[in-house]
C-alpha cells in the first residue's frame, strides 16, 4: 500500500468524522471500518465520471447500509463530484443536500434513496437485472452487442443481513445468477443493541455459497491493494458476489 493511498484513506476518515461531529449525530463505526474499501472502489475500480454523474453506463453504488452516508458524501467530495465543503457540513440539516438517509441524486452521485434495513439490497438486484434486460433488448438487433457493462455495488451491514426483504432479494439474485452485482459487507459483528452473536448465528459464507454466490472474506480491510484484487476477482466470477470485510 503506497503512501498516497494511506494519506487519502486517512483524509477520508477525518473528513467523514468531521461531518458527523458537525452534525452532532451519525455512525462513525462504519465510516472507519469501510474507508479503505470506499476509497479503493472510487480510486481503483469504479467506472464513473464525476463531471457527468448521470452517465448511463456508469457503475452504480447503492447504500443499503444507509448510515455509511457521511463516508460516501466525503468520498464524492474528494472524487470531484459537484458537492462543496459547506454542503458536506450541512449533513442531516433541514433541506440540505446531504441528508442522513441518502436520497436519489441529492447530491449528484447518489444512485438510490435508501434507509430501511435491507431495502437497498433489492434496489441493487433490480439495477443489475435491468442491465441484463436492456442488453437483451439490444441483442435482438445484434446478438454480439453488449453495450451495457456496468457493475452494481451495494454496501451492506449486519442489519441488512438480518432483514427479511434482503433475504428474498439475495435468493433471487442467486437463482437468476445475476452477475455484475457485488455486495460489500461491513461484517463488524455489532448491532445497535450489542454483539451480533446475541441475535444472529448464521454462517454467511456457506449460506451465500449455497445461494450460488461467489464469496470472499478479507481479514485486512485497510489494504487497498488486496481490496482491489478481491473486487476484481468478484467481477470476473460471473456470479453475484459477496465480499466480507
Can you annotate each of these PLM segments?
Residues 50, 106-245:
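Glycine-rich ThDP/TPP pyrophosphate-binding loop and its adjacent helix/strand module
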Residues 1-153:
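Thiamine diphosphate
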